[in-house]
Amino acid sequence: MMALWSLLHLTFLGFSITLLLVHGQGFQGTAAIWPSLFNVNLSKKVQESIQIPNNGSAPLLVDVRVFVSNVFNVDILRYTMSSMLLLRLSWLDTRLAWNTSAHPRHAITLPWESLWTPRLTILEALWVDWRDQSPQARVDQDGHVKLNLALATETNCNFELLHFPRDHSNCSLSFYALSNTAMELEFQAHVVNEIVSVKREYVVYDLKTQVPPQQLVPCFQVTLRLKNTALKSIIALLVPAEALLLADVCGGLLPLRAIERIGYKVTLLLSYLVLHSSLVQALPSSSSCNPLLIYYFTILLLLLFLSTIETVLLAGLLARGNLGAKSGPSPAPRGEQREHGNPGPHPAEEPSRGVKGSQRSWPETADRIFFLVYVVGVLCTQFVFAGIWMWAACKSDAAPGEAAPHGRRPRL
């Protein structure tokens, strides 16, 4: 009781804040109680009031309700996300209770510097912006304290990269009270999803809280489950690669004798080399569990390279064979054949020449076989990649800090 009045006196002089009642009544009779501020024991009582309340052998239980109002600026390349939260903390401090029969006030508000409040630190935060620099705590007549803290923060997130850009990730926010021990303080956390806007690439589809066990420092953890719903990434990454692969397959329909085929294939390969560099740069990377698209784009590059090499080799062999046929001994003139009594080719030989001319050379036959095998290989690649995408899973190695609770030495 005396600690409460000491806080009230300090509030009037040090902070110049008017105490408000639930029903809107102002504090009266201040002139009569001001002389007590010069009491010698005042500083001791004030110091006692800003210490953690004693709950006997049990730790003080602080109920925390986390209201998530927005998640934005999710950057998977930087492994960061921004969020806006409202923390509603409540606990019991019997030192602040008063008798309503003597002092008919149901509730008062106090600046949080004048009483004990849990000092929270977000472990994953790069920066934290507390929206209210001087929040007010509401104290009920029975000593229940309620404090609302609004904040915006940017935190690190361990994104799931394997299935990017259709990834599902769990991002955690760990709140620690570093000025207290687990024997003094305990959190009971709840989370509420108040996000009303879904026009984001990443959508929060689930929230959960937990209190990690075996911690020397009291803490609670809020986990946000994010789902990537962006269609832009799929169009920007997959459509150009698939279009070039389809164009390469269609290029196999050109005859091997066509001069344009080699230029067509080489142009596609060079175009995909430039595209491959930009595609890989647009994908996130990690020491483990890299996106499957990195391997997929590399396989497409190998397919285009193999197709181009096949065209160049077989076209070169075909041109060399034609050049050898042209440089062979030329047949004797028709006049000389008649002089030697050779009446010329038999009429039955003419159809045989036509049949022989319609037959394909072995490079062209090999090209047709390669084309069929290449088409089958491309289709199999698509189906195999789809199966791997659906059933593949990858678990990264545990970080060194996750091998032991906070404040302990890692296990060897």
Swiss-Prot record:
Pfam family, one: Neur_chan_LBD
Record's keyword terms, sorted: Cell membrane, Disulfide bond, Glycoprotein, Ion channel, Ion transport, Ligand-gated ion channel, Membrane, Receptor, Signal, Transmembrane, Transmembrane helix, Transport, Zinc
Gene Ontology molecular function terms on file: extracellular ligand-gated monoatomic ion channel activity; ligand-gated monoatomic cation channel activity; ligand-gated monoatomic ion channel activity; pH-gated monoatomic ion channel activity; transmembrane signaling receptor activity; zinc ion binding
A GO cellular component annotation in the UniProt record: transmembrane transporter complex
Keyword Glycoprotein: yes
Activity: how regulated: Inhibited by the divalent cations magnesium and calcium.
Leader peptide range in chain numbering: 1-25
Family matches, as Gene3D superfamilies: Neurotransmitter-gated ion-channel ligand-binding domain, Neurotransmitter-gated ion-channel transmembrane domain
Alphabetized InterPro entries for the sequence: Neur_chan_lig-bd (IPR006202), Neur_chan_lig-bd_sf (IPR036734), Neur_channel (IPR006201), Neuro-gated_channel_TM_sf (IPR036719), Neuro_actylchol_rec (IPR038050), Neurotransmitter_ion_chnl_CS (IPR018000)
Region (Disordered): 328-360
Membrane protein topology class: Multi-pass membrane protein
Stretches in topological domain Cytoplasmic: 255-265, 320-368
Residues carrying covalently attached carbohydrate according to the record: 41, 55, 99, 170
Extracellular side: 26-233, 287-298, 390-412
Catalyzed reactions per annotation: Na(+)(in) = Na(+)(out); K(+)(in) = K(+)(out)
Cited function: Ligand-gated cation channel that allows the movement of sodium and potassium monoatomic cations across cell membranes when activated by zinc (Zn2+), copper (Cu2+), and changes in pH. Could also transport cesium.
The name this protein goes by in its record: Ligand-gated cation channel ZACN
Naturally occurring in which organism (per UniProt): Homo sapiens
Lineage: Eukaryota, Metazoa, Chordata, Craniata, Vertebrata
